[in-house]
Every structure is written in C-alpha cells, then in structure tokens.
Amino acid sequence: MRLNNLQLKNNLNLSNKLDKERIPEHIAIIMDGNGRWATKKGLPRSFGHNKGVSVLKEIIKASKNIDCKVLTVYAFSTENWIRPSNEVDFLINLFEKVLKKEISEIHQESIKIKFIGDLSPLPNSLKLLIKSSEALTNNNKKFTLNICVNYGGRQEIVKAAKEIAIKSSSGKIKPSDIDEQLFNSELLTKGSMDPELLIRTSGEKRISNFLLWQLAYSEIYVTDVLWPDFTESEFLKAIIDYQSRNRRFGGIESLSNESFEDSCYSSLSKND
C-alpha cells in the first residue's frame, strides 16, 4: 500500500509520540468490519475481505516497526460458520491463497506464524499448508504472528478443562496441582504471553468469544474505523492511548497503606 507524503508525515509525528520503553509486547486485534465496509461502497462482501488482507500486511509491518513481539489476530471464529456458505467458502479459499502467496516473504522477514483454533474442519490442502508454514517459520524469533482460525474462547477453555479432568482421573496430576499455570499449559495459546492490548475495529464494544482467558487484564481500545480503513496511523493512535493508561491489575494507583488509612480516617471524620 503506497502512502502519500501527508500520511507518511502523520505516521512519523505519531511515532515520535510513542514511549519506546512502554511498547506492548503482545497486541491482539479483532479485525471487524470488512463486510460493512464493502456494503457501504456498494461492493460484494468479498471485496472487503480482500482489502482486509492488505490492511493486515500493513499492520504486521507497523507492529514490527515499533518493536512489538507478538501480534494475534481474529481471522475466523467458531461462530463464523453460520454465515452464508458462499462467504465461508470464499474466506477459506482466501486463507489458502494468501498463505501460499505470502509464506516465503513471511519467512524472509523472520516472522514465526502460528495458527490457533480447531483446524480439523478445514480442507486437507489448507491443513497441510498450515502445517508446512508453521514448520518453515518455527525457528524465527524476531516476531510472532498468531492467526486465530475456527477459534472460540469458550471452546478453548472447555477443551483445557477436559484435558485436565482426564489427567486428574488417570492419576497423572492431583487436584491440588491445578492452578493458573497448569491451566495455561492446556490452552491453545500455551507458551505465549497474554496480550497487553486488544484493539477492536468497527466500534463494536464486545470481545466476541476471543481470548476469554488471556484478556483478563488486557487494555481494550475500540475504534469506529472499519478494518479495511484501519491504517498505520490508527494503529499508532491505539498504542498512544494504551500508553496513557495506568495498568493496575486490580490494584490501586500509587496509594500506600498509610495514605489509604489516612483517607479512610478523613472520610469517617467528615461523617461524625
């Protein structure tokens, strides 16, 4: 995607506002709005999906440029099978077409690619391509691209619970062994850090069964911009917004025990 001088200048200005010490290492994105984008333009929904692929390539590059380590994108959910069959077929064919075309460049860019989800319903040709692509890029360390295909957060949690139950009933583990670390090890995302930032395009304020366990403490950024219109500038705005927040993980902001007690005493005194 060619950028004009104004866009390049805008991207540079936004990049200069970033705190290089507070770049999120793992960013997750719900890429929403392809169909609506196409419909608004009087085009078939397939045009939106094709444009969405171009945008993803731009955002992968932007993620690497700011030294983000992991990008996880929601490409196809377990619920997406209920869409019209012609759209589902188009999307599955698009995955295969794009992966065939881009895998060499992905490898050359030292990107490790991983597909997350239940891949069993996919065509054999796509499953073989996914397997070979993951094997080819497995030793790449600079950047990881996780693509969630036929993925559902609830299904992932249920699967992990079943695996733990089987191991417990067979005596491989004791109930007392079960903790967050063990549960994490049974998830499809095992070995990957949790996202610090979730970006959702299209203005929808929900997480749509995406990474339900992993997003427990993620900052969430929602933009009204539809995914095909999502640019590097919009991406950088999300990072800047993230950096303006104070991640407390359930705690409180810079408040010592003494000041908390003083605050409580002061409130009680006012009520006397």
Curated annotation (Swiss-Prot):
This is Isoprenyl transferase. Homodimer. GO terms for biological process: polyprenol biosynthetic process. Keywords: Magnesium, Metal-binding, Transferase. It comes from the Bacteria. One of its GO terms (molecular function) is ditrans,polycis-polyprenyl diphosphate synthase [(2E,6E)-farnesyl diphosphate specific] activity. Its EC number is 2.5.1.-. Catalyzes the condensation of isopentenyl diphosphate (IPP) with allylic pyrophosphates generating different type of terpenoids. The active site is at 32, 80 (proton acceptor). SUPFAM superfamilies: Undecaprenyl diphosphate synthase. Its cofactor is Mg(2+). Substrate binds at residues 33-37, 45, 49, 77-79, 81, 83, 200, 206-208. PANTHER family: DEHYDRODOLICHYL DIPHOSPHATE SYNTHASE 2 (PTHR10291:SF0), DEHYDRODOLICHYL DIPHOSPHATE SYNTHASE FAMILY MEMBER (PTHR10291). HAMAP family: ISPT (MF_01139). Binds 2 magnesium ions per subunit. It comes from Prochlorococcus marinus subsp. pastoris (strain CCMP1986 / NIES-2087 / MED4). It holds the Pfam family Prenyltransf. Belongs to the UPP synthase family. It is an enzyme of class 2 (transferase). Mg(2+) binds at residues 32, 219.
